Regions:
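N-terminal cationic and glycine-rich segments that engage phosphates or anionic surfaces
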Residues: 1-103, 108-437
Length: 437
């Protein structure tokens, strides 16, 4: 990995791209500390220090914003609206024929879907910004903080609208920065910003665990977190690289006087075909009842049950629900993102076949069978990766705000591997260009 970056810095074109990407990252991190008008930041700092290590319902969104959410800054929403919009459009592509047709139109269709994603991102940013401001005004953003109600001292409508506009504009700027990295830098822009956002929360989260620890001044908890985190990174790297290669052969065809085909290749089916999406889906779904209960009035029985069972990450009901939702969404997302019938039809169209399997419907059935078999261990792996941090700290009685959580590790390792692959492919391409000259 370090060798690839060193070689990239020795190549002028890649060095410019890497420096441009680093410059955008600096701009993004500066934006996460720019305050918005109408917020009492002394009260915010007091509540953040009191809530350190226990971010509650907003922990996931705060992680994706690089800690900017609980600071209520311009980039408070981070890239979460874009992630949500991308997932929604990906799901709608399967349901709405018009979007499915656009997806098959190539570059023009992809550009149109990207435009829809931008519009939906802005709409979601307005909704999420309004919800965040309303939560901060009511004092529910930092429940239990003594000065939570004074975070937004001015309750005027104009102040609320100004705050929402600032956060929505910040989301649009983040989206633009991500697209700049994609076009002129290295790697996928949104993935890089996601990587940076998560990595930025690691030092404070680790230090919070050390401060809250009780064994040897917190150093035992601190060391155990580092050890478990390294083991998880190694496991994630191993599984993310694992794939089942389905062999494919292409028959020879004579077109004019030339012979085409006759080659052998394979279809790479990853063990974790769904990626990190099931974990995000499951986390978001579990936040909904807890969020409703937090804003609901009165002391009804259902509200008390949700508060006790679905807001604490170490509660058995929460753990079981989280695990089952991850397994379900892993199968669900694989089913909508990989179409065996479409793959089988494309293979048949170009004269490809799987040895021992007839072309057409039998090929589609075989691919579905293989995919279901490898999705089972993939879904169980996702569930375990998401729950291991919580289970590791239950014995120590430390905070469940584990910095090496399943979502963060999956994203960091996935983005890191993909970025290194892209750098190596560009280095290889430039080597070939030098050879051809």
């Amino acid at each position: 990995m370090l060798t690839a970056f060193a070689r990239a810095f020795r190549t002028p074109d890649l060095r410019k791209k890497l420096l441009f990407t680093l410059g955008i990252i600096v701009v993004y991190r500066v934006g996460t500390h720019i305050p918005i008008p109408g917020v009492n930041y002394k009260a915010v700092q007091t509540c953040v220090s009191e809530a350190s290590g226990n971010q509650g319902l907003f922990g996931l969104v705060n992680m994706f914003s690089g800690g900017a959410l609980l600071q209520i800054t311009v980039f408070a929403l981070g890239i979460m609206p874009y992630i949500t919009a991308s997932i929604i459009l990906q799901l709608l592509t399967v349901v709405i024929p018009r979007l499915e047709a656009l997806k098959k139109e190539g570059q023009a269709g992809t550009a149109k879907i990207t435009q829809y994603t931008r519009y939906l991102t802005v709409a979601l940013a307005i909704l999420q910004g309004t919800g965040l401001v309303a939560t901060a005004r009511s004092g529910a953003l930092f429940s239990g903080c003594t000065v939570a109600s004074s975070i937004v001292p001015d309750q005027a409508i104009f102040t609320t609208i100004t705050m929402v506009i600032c956060m929505t504009a910040g989301t649009a700027v983040v989206m633009w920065l991500g697209e700049l990295i994609t076009d002129r830098g290295i790697g996928n822009g949104m993935s890089i910003l996601m990587f940076i956002s998560i990595a930025a929360t690691f030092p404070s989260a680790l230090w919070a665990i050390k401060k809250q620890g009780t064994l040897a001044g917190g150093w035992i908890e601190f060391g155990s977190v580092i050890a478990v985190g390294l083991v998880m990174v190694a496991l994630v790297v191993f599984v993310e690289q694992a794939q089942r290669r389905v062999p494919v052969q292409y028959a020879k065809r004579m077109i004019g006087r030339r012979s085409y085909g006759g080659t052998s290749t394979y279809i790479p089916l990853k063990v974790n075909q769904a990626g990190v999406i099931p974990v995000i889906f499951a986390s978001s779904l579990l936040y909904i009842p807890a969020l409703v209960a937090q804003f609901a009035g009165g002391n009804s029985g259902w509200k008390e049950w949700i508060t006790q069972n679905l807001t604490k990450g170490d509660h058995p009901i929460y753990i079981v629900s989280y695990f089952l939702l991850i397994v379900f969404f892993a199968f669900f997302y694989v089913a909508i993102s990989f179409n065996p019938e479409e793959v089988a039809d494309n293979m048949k169209k170009y004269g490809g076949f799987i040895p021992g399997i007839r072309a057409g419907r039998p090929t589609a059935e075989y691919l579905s069978y293989v995919l279901n078999r490898i999705t089972w261990p993939g879904s169980l792996y996702l569930g375990l990766i998401a729950l291991v941090p919580t289970m590791a700290l239950v014995g120590f009685g430390a905070s469940n705000n584990f910095p090496f959580g399943g979502t963060s590790i999956l994203i960091i390792v996935g983005v890191g591997l993909e970025t290194v692959k892209q750098i190596e492919s560009q280095l290889q391409q430039r080597n070939y260009e030098g050879f051809l000259r």
